[in-house]
């Protein structure tokens, strides 16, 4: 799957961007933390669209400045409305609460548990520990780390292969671009690509360029 982030600040713009993005990608990621205001009704609308609902905490590199309680309630609302995926951080103390809630109401939502390091790619043993912890909590493990070298890129690709079909792994930055291009072949459930001029992370590839490259590889 190709996932395209939606990073608009206005709700109506976000919906329009999502519709346009789905002409090129398979799903979108709604970065709810970037919206000026968000309501439960907005989450209901987002949940109708094939998407990942992400409300990234400020302490994990996001823009959510309101209370964590509101954040968790909005994510629960997405789960209640059977959003395709919700993303919750490994460091979030209430991640298990979301999983329990999902199971109790028998929602079809898959829960992605994520970890980010915007400066480096940790050693492989540390990354394995992260992924194992994530898989004990949610359905899909995700990590996005900054790749500073080819060695970092190989490390990330190796882990994708180890956890084939259970992981989303990304190498941010120029050195990590190969992880975005080869990720699907190495076992990542999805790869992120952006609409022109709307990258949500360093090194994100334009979706049209990515599709051209993937067609050449095939």
From Swiss-Prot:
3-dehydroquinate binds at residues 29-31, 56, 180, 200, 204. Gene3D superfamilies: Aldolase class I. The active site is at residues 116, 142. GO terms for molecular function: 3-dehydroquinate dehydratase activity. Keywords: Amino-acid biosynthesis, Aromatic amino acid biosynthesis, Lyase, Schiff base. It holds the Pfam family DHquinase_I. Pathway: Metabolic intermediate biosynthesis; chorismate biosynthesis; chorismate from D-erythrose 4-phosphate and phosphoenolpyruvate: step 3/7. The keyword Lyase applies. One of its GO terms (biological process) is 3,4-dihydroxybenzoate biosynthetic process. Signal peptide: none annotated. Involved in the third step of the chorismate pathway, which leads to the biosynthesis of aromatic amino acids. Catalyzes the cis-dehydration of 3-dehydroquinate (DHQ) and introduces the first double bond of the aromatic ring to yield 3-dehydroshikimate. This is 3-dehydroquinate dehydratase. It comes from Methanococcus maripaludis (strain C5 / ATCC BAA-1333). The gene is aroD.
